[in-house]
């Protein structure tokens, strides 16, 4: 099922996305995301954004979509736990190590493959589903986006 997913790099873009009909927004919270150039959100702002979106029927996805070092994993685990506690609907990931970490730190939180995971075939999307990812953001250049499956 397709959804209109919009970036939210700060409060103004979050409100614009919601008011423009986005089904879901993705945003950075903390240091471990590919949206480092965006304003991103503090923990308190993230909680406010989740409440704002959920009151309007919009889902919130945390971006945890960069490659992490072993030293960064404990901080990422804490971030996953906080995001789950604050009501995030899912996490966009790139790194299969984060997939494993998330299964331990926040097993109830659905995982989505970010475009940074570089899935571009129907076979790759199916394998991600077999491994428990509930949504895949295909590369925009992907022919698999044309598939009916």
Which residue ranges define each predicted feature?
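Conserved, mostly hydrophobic/aromatic
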Residues: 17, 95, 128
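Glycine-rich, proline-tolerant flexible connector loops at the mouths of alpha/beta enzymes
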Residues: 26-44, 64-70
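Single conserved hydrophobic/aromatic residue that forms the stacking wall/gate
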Residues: 140-149
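Hydrophobic faces of well-ordered beta-strands that scaffold small-molecule active sites
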Residues: 4-7, 25-27, 60-64, 91-93, ...
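Alpha-helix-loop-beta-strand connector modules within alpha/beta enzyme cores
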Residues: 43-61, 102-108
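Active-site-proximal loop/turn and secondary-structure-junction residues that shape catalytic pockets
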Residues: 9-12, 31, 64-68, 96-98, ...
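N-terminal basic/disordered segments at the start of proteins
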Residues: 3-24
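Catalytic cores of alpha/beta
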Residues: 13, 122-127
């Amino acid at each position: 099922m397709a959804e209109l997913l919009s970036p939210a790099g700060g409060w103004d873009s979050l409100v614009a996305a919601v008011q423009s009909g986005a089904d879901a927004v993705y945003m950075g919270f903390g240091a471990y995301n590919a949206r480092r150039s965006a304003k991103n959100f503090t923990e308190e702002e993230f909680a406010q954004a989740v409440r704002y979106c959920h009151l309007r029927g919009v889902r919130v996805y945390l971006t945890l979509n960069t490659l992490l070092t072993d030293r960064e994993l404990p901080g990422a685990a804490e971030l996953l736990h906080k995001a789950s506690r604050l009501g995030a609907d899912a996490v966009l990931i790139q790194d299969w190590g984060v997939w494993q970490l998330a299964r331990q730190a926040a097993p109830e939180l659905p995982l989505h493959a970010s475009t940074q995971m570089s899935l571009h075939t129907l076979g790759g999307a199916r394998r991600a589903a077999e491994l428990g990812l509930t949504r895949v953001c295909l590369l925009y250049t992907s022919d698999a986006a044309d598939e009916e499956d």
